[in-house]
Structures are given as structure tokens and as C-alpha cells.
Amino acid sequence: MHTRKVKKVAILGTQGVPANYGGFETLVENIIGENCSNDIRYTVFCSAKDMPQRMKEYKGAILKYVNLRANGVQSIPYDIVSMMRCMRGYDTILILGVSGCIFLPFLRLFSRSRIIVNIDGLEHRRAKWKGWVKRFLKMSESFAIRHAHTIIADNRGIQDYVRHVYDKDAKLVTYGGDHVLVGIDKEREIEILEQYGLEPDGYCMSLCRIEPENNCHIALEAFAKSKEKLIFIGNWKANGYSRKLKEQYSGYDNIKLLDSIYDLEILHAMRKNCKCYIHGHCAGGTNPSLVEAMFFGRPILAFNIVYNRETTHHKANYYQNCKELLKLIGRVPDNGKKMSKVAHRYYTWKHVAKEYEALY
């Protein structure tokens, strides 16, 4: 009887696990552990600055630490140092994001590992990046796509972009979202709603980072002209854009602006009982918050871009401006069951974990 060889896989490019927040951190959290096959042995590179508890193992994965921050100006050296430390001893290196991929030609030169890069959501196109940062991210993306053995796109729109711009084929592996189904009882659910002054089907909901590319201003402008109630969760003190919106709209009786919430029980109760979920993102590939919302079977109103259409399999309802959104919230379409069906078929972490393992 032959035993299958255990594959050693290094994951780098995230803050690390346990996940506090962030799409890639949540991805790692859910492809290791109970969703991981017995013949895969993960090592996750973590930031010692961001993860001060410095656990040695987590959910069966080995944790190694780099003494730099994973985000901001240190993200590039953080990724490069991580790559240098995993040149030997791994069958596969999974890199999440492209910021350090200028080092990829050297990694290919000195390592025999299979290199897989998830290029995320075309970071260089985000409005928040300007000048040399934008050019650097575009160059890093180019290095990633040209030098990795396998490129992962989490959305068909990203896959089409890679084919059109680089004449390369990317593997489509989506994002999971069923970790948000925490299964709280009805009594706790009602308690949470009462805590926030909410009633089932009595409010619409949105959740995101408060940035221009997430079109928060469109949702707020629409609800300022409507009698419908909006619960909008985000980091309202993070930047000039968010602070300006908070100052402008916090006086409306039907608009409640809540600071970021990470408690899955609270989010479960809010998502499950909202009248509809509004998703304004216009950048990136598959947005985790959209996938998560789809699992609750509530109607989705999404900004009309290819990534959101692909994520929802063209079964949500879409808007391009305040006028179109105002029309939708005045008469919310019933697409919730379709959203739940798509989510349970394509966006479970068990499915996503197997898709990744097939590439190792």
C-alpha cells in the first residue's frame, strides 16, 4: 500500500493567523485546519509586529515570524524577507498579493519550489494609490504574472484581465464566506437587534472600508433622499473622506453610522434580518464582504461593475448612481434566494481549500 507524500506548502503575504480581519488573512484561516487534507502541511509566515502572541502552531499549521509589519511601507521588505526564508524546504510557495513580487525572478533562480501567486484585485488600479506607488504596483503585478508557475484570479473579471493584458491563463479560485454562519439562537438574535434599535426587515445594510472606491457617498446620498433606514458599518474616522461623510450624514434620523464591527454573532444577526444588503465596491476582484452577505439569503443591490456581476453570477440587482439605487431601495427586488443558492454552491471554504490543494 502506497502512502501519499505530504506536501509542504509555505504561505506568505499576510499579517498571519489567527485572523483578525482582512481578506487574505481570512482565506488562510479557512484553508488550514479542518478544511485541510491530511497530505498537506502548511507553514504560514506572520508579522511579529502585528501578531505579538507569536504562537508556534495554529490549526495544525507551523507559524514563522518576520520582524516587520505586513502592511504599509514595510509590506515590500516583509514579503521579500519571507521569500528569502522559504527558498528551501517547501514543495510549494503560495504568495498572496503582489507587493513583494519584484523579488520573484531571484526566488525562481534559487528555489525549486512551485510558486503560486494570488494577484488579488488589481491593486494598482485603486484610486488611493498615486504616482510612483501606482507604477510600482503595476510593475510588481507584471513580475508576478510573468515569473510565477501558476497565477490565481479570484474572479472571472480578473482572469479575463490577465489573459487580455499578459496573454497568460490564470486559474479561477474564488473566496469563501460560510465562516460567517455562526448559528446563534433566536433569543440572542433578538437581543442584538434590540441593542442596536433594529427590527427584522426594518433596515437596509452596508459594510465596508469607508473609501471613495467603495462608493459610500452614493449609498448615503440615496438614503438621505429616502425614508428607508440604513445601517452603515465602517471605519468612519480613518481618512478625510470618511470623516466628511460622517459629519454630513450623521444628523439624518434614518441613517445610522456604526464603527467597524468584527463580532460574527452581531454581524450574523444584522445580515440575516436586513431588508437588503448594499455593496458599493467598484475595485478589486471578488470582495469578501459581498460573498459573506450572499449566504444570508437577503436581496443584494450591488454597484454595476464586472467583478460584482461575476461574483453574484448576474443574479443580483445593480446600480450605477444615486438615482438608480434610490429606485431599487424604493422597491427592493427579491433576489435573496438566488444569492444564497450561488453562495452555497460556489463559495464554501471546503470547496475553496480543495481548489487550492489541486494546484500544489
Describe each PLM feature range:
Residues 74-87, 92-120, 285:
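An aromatic- and histidine-rich active-site surface loop
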Residues 51-57, 190-191, 229-258, 265-266, ...:
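Short, structured helix-loop element that forms part of the nucleotide-activated donor/catalytic region
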Residues 276, 295-302:
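Short hydrophobic beta-strand element within catalytic cores of glycosyltransferases
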Residues 25-29, 205, 209-225:
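A conserved mid-protein helix/loop that constitutes part of the nucleotide-sugar donor-binding site
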Residues 334-360:
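A charged, aromatic-enriched C-terminal amphipathic alpha-helix characteristic of glycosyltransferases
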Residues 84-87, 133-151:
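Membrane-proximal helix-turn-helix segments that form the acceptor-binding/catalytic region
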Residues 4-7, 14-20, 33-71, 157-165:
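N-terminal strand-loop element at the rim of the active site
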